[in-house]
């Protein structure tokens, strides 16, 4: 992809350079930014999978591409690490409102990165690019979480050890290419601890309580 630096006005280049420099020195928690010295509009990023989610323990590579109309138009975000998530398409494209209709020129790169990290905590199945992940999130959270964890272990496992984490960040710093896109692997059974898991567990508990109450009434009628 060609660089858009030459298409950006000098004052925008200065603003981007300033924010990227700040992000590199003082990144948000769990996020690291690796500027491309040859192309400021192509930002390489790693995001640690948030605790309490199926992505915990994973290290996810992504990139932000700033277009020639930035900041009037939002950047485009792509996961380079394979991930099972409703709002991430087959090519890694990220679907989140801040990168579309909610974007304003006043929002910065830091805000975008924090929003993407939050998307790992609270996926939005209503705007799914991965329809299977969106359906499982709504209908069978355990299966969704198992699939997400499995791909996290396979493709995002660099975060499991300090040496693996260092190796992954070194790859990005040296301009390593995206990880290969292996096909989705069927999930295994298992639960998960996190906000979405608790929500679905609560719904199941209500259904079980209602069923027990109905069974008790039927038993009393037979007496």
UniProtKB/Swiss-Prot annotation:
Positions where N-acetylmethionine occurs in the chain: 1
Q: How does it assemble?
A: Component of the APC/C complex, composed of at least 14 distinct subunits that assemble into a complex of at least 19 chains with a combined molecular mass of around 1.2 MDa. Within this complex, directly interacts with ANAPC2 and ANAPC4. Interacts with CDC20, FZR1/CDH1 and VHL.
**Short name of one Pfam family for this protein?**
UQ_con
Coiled-coil blocks: none
Keyword set includes Transferase: yes
State the organism of origin. Mus musculus
> What name does UniProt use for this protein?
Ubiquitin-conjugating enzyme E2 S
Q: What is its EC number?
A: 2.3.2.23
Which GO terms fall under biological process for this protein? anaphase-promoting complex-dependent catabolic process; cell division; exit from mitosis; free ubiquitin chain polymerization; positive regulation of ubiquitin protein ligase activity; protein K11-linked ubiquitination; protein K27-linked ubiquitination; protein K29-linked ubiquitination
Post-translational changes noted in the entry:
Autoubiquitinated by the APC/C complex during G1, leading to its degradation by the proteasome.
